[in-house]
Amino acid sequence: MHRSLAIFAGLILTGIGLSLSPSATPRAAETPSEIKGAFRLPEKNGWTFVHLQGTPHEIGFQNGYLLAPEIADTLKVVQLEATHDSKKEWAFFRDAAQNMMWPHIEQEYRDELQGISDGATAHGVKIDLWDVVALNAAEEWSYYVKYYDKQHRIQTASLGVPEHCSAFVATGSYTKDGKAVIAHNNWTGYLDGERWTIIYDITPARGKRMLMDGLPGVIHSADDFVTNSAGITITEATIGHFSGYDPAAIPEFVRARKAAQYSASIDDFARIMKDGNNGGYANTWLIADINRNEIGRLELGLTNVTLEKKTDGYFVGSNFPINESLIKEELTSIPRI
């Protein structure tokens, strides 16, 4: 698979807000009541802006209804990539979504995931709940597969060319105006990269409003590039060569969404990400708090976790960890820098 598509996203955070006003009206009256207040705008420069609001099930329903064809298309890609890379059938991932992940997903996000399935179905595209959960877990399946194969003494298939990304966050004397700057650079495969084009504007009944990029049919960014109405902006770079997974803990996509929705500080973000950490999609997270003009780096292994914060300085991430204990204990090999 080609893995050279670059997607660059950067925000200079001075005065950034989430006060977007829709220029489109809701769909016609015959559409489901759950769609009220939600809308999608025509594609512009390759991006599709989607506004979702309401209860967890309403937000999910709107996602599924407004993006039904795109979700079905993206699901085919995720199925192809997951089965090709792991040498396992899609039923393996559906079963893990239902029996391994679902018991550790709290009700709020269960409702939203079910809503995505219900919304797509209401739009004439039948998408099963377990397909929706498996789609949302796309970025952490490789971690589970390595764990599963090790437990069952199976040789895990290796990828020829891994994906890469890099990011930085800076503040104080390291930026032109002394305020926070954050940016992210992501090289991903052509198949999923060309579909990673949804800009979600989500106003939940509880928690913070969020603006993020993502695939169709997901509850989190996974790219990751997110900012919320409390001034918390988040990105990450994956920790390369990481090995570790706890199937009895909370999926990464649930923790990442919850952290984006409920964080009002860097400490909030770190606490939510660490609580129930399953080791899936292990990342070096970079965070900016624009209200406090503070930045942070959360290096989140399964057993080794480091949080650093600064009000003057910078942090970077580029698929390699800093924590020496994490390098020694949780990597299969030392990344070449």
Which residues does each predicted region cover?
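Bacterial N-terminal signal peptides that target proteins for export
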Residues: 1-9
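N-terminal mature-domain region immediately after signal-peptide cleavage
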Residues: 20-267, 272-280, 285-311, 317-318, ...
